[in-house]
Amino acid sequence: MYHSFFFRTFVPSIYFAIIRMHLSKAQIKWVRSLQLKKNREAEGVFVAEGEKCINELCNAFELVLLATPDNATSTEIEQMSSLRTPQGTIGVFRQPASDTRYPTDELILALDGIQDPGNLGTIIRTCDWFGIHDILCSHDTADCYNPKVVQATMGALARVRLHYVDLPQVLAEIKAQGTPLYGTLLEGTNMYGSNAIPDKQHGVIIMGNEGNGISSAVRQHITHPLLIPSYPADAVTSESLNVGIATAIVLAEFRR
């Protein structure tokens, strides 16, 4: 069977230890319950689906349960899945211990109230592409272990660390160290200008909430407000960009 071959090939150390017998009704019910944040937090685990995503996450997280056609029927996998079209494999992983440590000598991202799981997942995946390894998140940012977030990252969660912190306080501390804090604002400086970004290798890039942008508590700490210009400048365009797309545009400029 394809699934057996995949997991024996790519995760051989855990395949036989985890797939021993058919999943019980209690296990199936438990996996389904993990769609709720309170249950994920209580158990200290999260769920991923699809062979590629699971294989990527096995490199960074402890796999505690694996459901495949070898130990669960298609109906049971559908019951456990949070996807409209289940991908046939489901993994439950141990959440790592909370870590508030973050680097201060490289470029990092800060998210202020990003609430849509799809946006957060896309941002994590984009950070992985552009070599951003740490993201500071306000406490009201979406849970990075939400199944929709995990799926949208396509395994990037294995390489990008998220730190849920008191964002205004942490940014104040970083600012006091002389670190530049960049934020996307409508009244910002055109980010393609020659002096808009003095240091592309070091600093914090702040992205705001989908509907309200960067909060006033966070905005006061920005040292370099940036504008993503629309083209042509005097044309009527959309009011704003999707935050995932905006993040990709900004990171691309910093890495250019």
Feature roles, as predicted:
Residues 46-48, 62-69, 180-186, 205-208:
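Short, hydrophobic beta-strand segments that form beta-sheet elements in well-ordered domains
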Residues 2-3, 15:
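Intrinsic-disorder-associated, low-complexity terminal segments enriched in Asp/Asn/His/Tyr and depleted
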Residues 183-238:
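Active-site/ligand-binding-proximal alpha/beta "capping" segment
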Residues 91, 129, 144, 151-156, ...:
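Structured adenosyl-cofactor binding patch, chiefly the S-adenosyl-L-methionine
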Residues 75-93:
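Glycine/small-residue-rich loop that forms an oxyanion/phosphate-binding "nest" at active or ligand-binding sites
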Residues 9-18:
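Short, positively charged and aromatic/hydrophobic N-terminal segments
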Residues 18, 103-188:
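RNA substrate-binding interface of SAM-dependent RNA methyltransferases
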Residues 18-66:
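Boundary-proximal intrinsically disordered activation/regulatory segments immediately upstream
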